Amino acid sequence: MKPDAAQVKTFLLQLQDSLCQQLSAVDGAPFIEDAWQREGGGGGRSRVLREGRVFEQAGVNFSHVHGDAMPASATAHRPELAGRSFEAMGVSLVVHPLNPYVPTSHANVRFFIAEKPGADPVWWFGGGFDLTPYYGFEEDAVHWHRTARDLCLPFGEEVYPRYKKWCDDYFYLKHRQEQRGIGGLFFDDLNTPDFDHCFAFMQAVGNGYADAYLPIVERRKATPYGERERHFQLYRRGRYVEFNLVWDRGTLFGLQTGGRTESILMSMPPLVRWEYDYQPEPGSPEAALSEFIQVRDWL
């Protein structure tokens, strides 16, 4: 079947609505919408929930940009895209909870298509979701990965292991030699066997995120915590910032190609701290995190 960008856009808009409704239902606070236009073509809807009871900040962004030609930075690696008009659309979200016992989560799903008269379109899907705990709970990690595996199973037994490994490899801070969190799923350049199959998988990932994350939020949101836990949460959020600004391809691409800065940096935590040569107390729950986030088979 010929790729249908309009169908993908309809799903993405519905997904943004659904995710905002579900997150608001947990927190009680509303999302504030900021609709924006891109000078070169397209625009989006950025929605942010701030200073809620459960979520210190949650951002759910939809964007749909298009143009007559790809930026040089994009065609350098993919010469087949030169001279083509393009459309890129997606939903991305990051949730930074207030309670340190609730993990931070990130998800995105996206679609890209480039066309020119007389030639087949070049298109692909990408996306995934990943979890960044501050205090590790095995039952949460198992639930997260089981949900990821179960949504992958209808598409083949090999899908979950492949995209789990890609996620582990991608969300790695080389300068710290540590994982960002416990991973999940990550896929890109997905265009086989056909459009319908790939679109169905992207929808499964987009819809599966809430099933993976919200039960963990409900389980941990009322856990008592104090200054020590909050201190550690803010310190570990520094790793999130480091990854996004140093290693994340999407962030770097957006900033280098004149993307909308406010939307790109919506993933940043509202508060964060660094501490020179911080060492957690041996044997403490804080010290246990480095072992917990090591790559492993959670299932």
Curated annotation (Swiss-Prot):
It is an enzyme of class 1 (oxidoreductase). This is Oxygen-dependent coproporphyrinogen-III oxidase. GO terms for biological process: protoporphyrinogen IX biosynthetic process. The gene is hemF. PANTHER family: COPROPORPHYRINOGEN III OXIDASE, MITOCHONDRIAL, OXYGEN-DEPENDENT COPROPORPHYRINOGEN-III OXIDASE, MITOCHONDRIAL. Homodimer. The record marks 175 as: Important for dimerization. Its cofactor is a divalent metal cation. It comes from Klebsiella pneumoniae subsp. pneumoniae (strain ATCC 700721 / MGH 78578). Substrate binds at residues 92, 108-110, 258-260. It catalyses: coproporphyrinogen III + O2 + 2 H(+) = protoporphyrinogen IX + 2 CO2 + 2 H2O. A divalent metal cation binds at residues 96, 106, 145, 175. Pathway: Porphyrin-containing compound metabolism; protoporphyrin-IX biosynthesis; protoporphyrinogen-IX from coproporphyrinogen-III (O2 route): step 1/1.
